[in-house]
Curated annotation (Swiss-Prot):
Residues 212-249 are annotated as: Disordered. GO terms for biological process: protein quality control for misfolded or incompletely synthesized proteins. This is ATP-dependent Clp protease proteolytic subunit. Its EC number is 3.4.21.92. GO terms for molecular function: ATP-dependent peptidase activity; ATPase binding; serine-type endopeptidase activity. The active site is at S107, H132. The gene is clpP. Cleaves peptides in various proteins in a process that requires ATP hydrolysis. Has a chymotrypsin-like activity. Plays a major role in the degradation of misfolded proteins. It catalyses: Hydrolysis of proteins to small peptides in the presence of ATP and magnesium. alpha-casein is the usual test substrate. In the absence of ATP, only oligopeptides shorter than five residues are hydrolyzed (such as succinyl-Leu-Tyr-|-NHMec, and Leu-Tyr-Leu-|-Tyr-Trp, in which cleavage of the -Tyr-|-Leu- and -Tyr-|-Trp bonds also occurs). Keywords: Chloroplast, Hydrolase, Plastid, Protease, Serine protease. It is an enzyme of class 3 (hydrolase). It comes from Oenothera elata subsp. hookeri.
C-alpha cells in the first residue's frame, strides 16, 4: 500500500482555533512546512526537482529577504547541471541558507550540502556523505566527436566542483583529488573534520524553527499580546539576548 502525501488540517487567518477539524482546510504537509521556510530535497536531483527548489527559494526570498532558509537534504545525487542550478540559486538569494544533511548525501547532494552558508551547514550524526568526480555515460555506439565534446564538458564541471570544495572546506587539494577518483564515503565526524559541515546535530535548530513558526502565527493574530515591552530588556545587561542564534550542537 503506497504511503502517499500526508495532509494536515490548517486554519486560515481569522479562523477560530477551536473549530472542528472538518471545517479546517486540509493541505499537504510540505505546504505547511514551507511556511517555516523549510525546503526539502528527498529525491534524485533532476531538472524538475531543481526548478521546484530554485523557484521556492526565490519566492521565499521575495516574501521576506531577512529570514533564514532551511534546506534539508537526503539525496543519492543526480544530474550535475541540475544540481548546479540549485547551488547557484543558493548563492544568489539574499537570506542565509542553512543546509541540513540527513540520511545519504551522495555526489551532487554533498556538493549542495557544502554550498550552504558558512557556519550554518549541519548534518545528522548517522548520515553519510559520498563524494566523487562528475562522470558521463558513454557507449560504443556514441560518435567519437560527441564523446570528445562531452569529455571536455565533464572536465570543466570537475574543475568547478574542485574549486568550490577547496574554497568552502578544509580538504587539501591532494586529498580531494585522491578522494574524487572513486566513491569516497564519510561519516558525519569525518565530514566535520574536513569542513564539509560545520556541526553535527540539528536538535536546537528544530526548536528554533518551532519558535519562529509560532512568532509568525502571532504576528497574524490581532489579539496576540504586545511583545514590544520585552524590548526594555535590551537595557538590562543581564537579560538574555533573544536575537542571538541558538548555539548549535
Amino acid at each position: 500500500m503506497p504511503i502517499g502525501m500526508p495532509k494536515i488540517p490548517f486554519l486560515l487567518d481569522g479562523d477560530e482555533e477551536d473549530e472542528e477539524e472538518d471545517d479546517a482546510t486540509w493541505v499537504d504537509l510540505y505546504n505547511v512546512l514551507y511556511r517555516t521556510r523549510s525546503i526539502f530535497l528527498g529525491d534524485a536531483i533532476h531538472f524538475e526537482v531543481a526548478n521546484h527548489i530554485a523557484g521556492l527559494m526565490i519566492f521565499l526570498t521575495i516574501q521576506d529577504a531577512t529570514q533564514n532558509l532551511y534546506f534539508f537534504i537526503n539525496s543519492p545525487g543526480g544530474l550535475a547541471v541540475a544540481g548546479l542550478l540549485i547551488y547557484d540559486t543558493m548563492q544568489y538569494v539574499t537570506p542565509p541558507v542553512y543546509t541540513l544533511g540527513l540520511g545519504v548525501l551522495a555526489s551532487m547532494a554533498s556538493f549542495l550540502l557544502v554550498g550552504g552558508e558558512t557556519s550554518k551547514r549541519l548534518m545528522g550524526p548517522n548520515g553519510r556523505v559520498m563524494i566523487h568526480q562528475p562522470e558521463s555515460d558513454y557507449t560504443h555506439k556514441d560518435q567519437s566527436l560527441e564523446v570528445q565534446l562531452d569529455s571536455g564538458e565533464v572536465e570543466d564541471i570537475r574543475k568547478m566542483v574542485i574549486r568550490v570544495y577547496l574554497e568552502r572546506t578544509r580538504l587539501p587539494r591532494e586529498v580531494l583529488n585522491d578522494h574524487l577518483e572513486r566513491n569516497y564515503f564519510m561519516t558525519a565526524t569525518e565530514a566535520k573534520y574536513y569542513g564539509i559541515v560545520d556541526d553535527i546535530g540539528i536538535q536546537n535548530l528544530l526548536a528554533r524553527l518551532r519558535a519562529e513558526s509560532a512568532s509568525q502565527d502571532n504576528s497574524l493574530d490581532p489579539d496576540a499580546p504586545d511583545e514590544s515591552a520585552s524590548q526594555d530588556n535590551s537595557l538590562d545587561p543581564d537579560a538574555p539576548d533573544e536575537t542571538r542564534p541558538p548555539k548549535l550542537r
